[in-house]
Amino acid sequence: MSAIRYELIKTDKQTGARLGKIHTPHGTFDTPMFMPVGTLATVKTMSPEELKAMGAGIILSNTYHLWLRPGEELIREAGGLHKFMNWDQPILTDSGGFQVFSLSKMRDIKEEGVHFRNHLNGDKLFLSPEKAIQIQNALGSDIMMSFDECPPYPASHEYMKKSVERTSRWAERGLKAHERPEDQGLFGIVQGGAYEDLRAQSAKDLVSLDFPGYSIGGLSVGEPKDVMNRVLEHTTPLLPANKPRYLMGVGSPDSLIDGVIRGVDMFDCVLPTRIARNGTCMTSSGRLVIKNAKFTHDFRPIDENCDCYTCKNYSRAYIRHLIRCEETFGIRLTTYHNLHFLLNLMKQVRGAIMEDRLADFREEFFEQYGFNRPDAKNF
């Protein structure tokens, strides 16, 4: 029996978007869901209790980074990642593939795996499909990812075809290496760049392997948003309706809503936490850069329509002061707000699906947020 089970609750009559639940060994979470990213077994500046309070049903951790520090064996010794970081709800781990291809300037891709340099100290390392699974088995996450290649955008059709074929072979090898299928659900990752024929081939290959869930990778890597939406429209119908669909690395409010409309259930991104550290906040009326001088004497909350801890207790003027002085508490406050904003947005999206009005909600949100303006700024 699979460790992961998807339950469809309702389909939105306006868009076909899915409302559901995903059942895991560490509990159930509602979908669509945004997953905060805890790269090194922590969501930067946030406690597990705070994440639960804001409605995070699942968080993500990074296999590559935990492999390097503190090492998967230490985490196994601690009783697994859940005990190590004191998080008793579901955890998803990536395979490390994206970090290998994005952080290492020197890498050599072979059929057996990837030889590359440790981005911390320059040491030579090797990561294979089997090793990526072995590390994740030691971590004990509820949902694991297959090892895949993440080609940059744009890439030629010829290169992408070879990459997709290799990723499919790696997925099969990883599935065979998986030692804990009853405790951990392993997802296959659909690749293919912007090429619809290669996306179809990748999806066909992976569906034939009968994974308990499917990820859509290789998007949000520099391609225009209309390209991403086109690829999603083509790809999600090729994936089983009775299994979860996870769009990797996407976290801007507009892309979350558009992804849900195109059949996606799960999302993750460092965006809300990364921009928070620079003092950029997501609000119901658009992006707010708290460092701007116009907020020096502004004693309103970041977002007057927000009921998060930050907005109920602190002013723009105070948070601006903290961020400008590089005080950690300022980063905590903006991080809390941004994560709460996205998690609450997904709660609103789920409510709109339940009421069969997601297309209307999208129009209202885009109008209020400013995405419909010709000069709209992307995050």
Swiss-Prot record:
- Positions bound to substrate: D94, S95, G96, G97, F98, D148, Q191, G218
* One BP annotation, GO: tRNA wobble guanine modification
**Pathway of action:** tRNA modification; tRNA-queuosine biosynthesis
Record-annotated residues binding Zn(2+)? C306, C308, C311, H337
The protein's annotated catalytic reaction(s) are: 7-aminomethyl-7-carbaguanine + guanosine(34) in tRNA = 7-aminomethyl-7-carbaguanosine(34) in tRNA + guanine
The UniProt note on the cofactor reads as follows: Binds 1 zinc ion per subunit.
The catalytic activity of this protein is classed by the Enzyme Commission as 2.4.2.29
Q: Which Pfam families match?
A: TGT
Task: Please state the span of the N-terminal signal peptide per the UniProt entry.
Answer: none
Cofactor (UniProt): Zn(2+)
What domain of life does the UniProt record list for this protein's source? Bacteria
Q: Which UniProt keywords apply?
A: Glycosyltransferase, Metal-binding, Queuosine biosynthesis, Transferase, tRNA processing, Zinc
Q: Which residues form the active site?
A: D94 (proton acceptor), D268 (nucleophile)
Gene Ontology MF terms: metal ion binding; tRNA-guanosine(34) queuine transglycosylase activity
**What InterPro entries does the annotation carry?**
ArchSynthase1/Queuine_TRR, TGT, TGT-like_sf, tRNA_ribo_trans-like
Q: Which family does it belong to?
A: Belongs to the queuine tRNA-ribosyltransferase family.
Per its UniProt record, what HAMAP family does this chain match?
Q_tRNA_Tgt (MF_00168)
Which purpose does this protein serve, as stated in its record? Catalyzes the base-exchange of a guanine (G) residue with the queuine precursor 7-aminomethyl-7-deazaguanine (PreQ1) at position 34 (anticodon wobble position) in tRNAs with GU(N) anticodons (tRNA-Asp, -Asn, -His and -Tyr). Catalysis occurs through a double-displacement mechanism. The nucleophile active site attacks the C1' of nucleotide 34 to detach the guanine base from the RNA, forming a covalent enzyme-RNA intermediate. The proton acceptor active site deprotonates the incoming PreQ1, allowing a nucleophilic attack on the C1' of the ribose to form the product.
- Provide the assembly information: Homodimer. Within each dimer, one monomer is responsible for RNA recognition and catalysis, while the other monomer binds to the replacement base PreQ1.
What name does UniProt use for this protein?
Queuine tRNA-ribosyltransferase
Organism in which the protein naturally occurs: Listeria monocytogenes serotype 4a (strain HCC23)
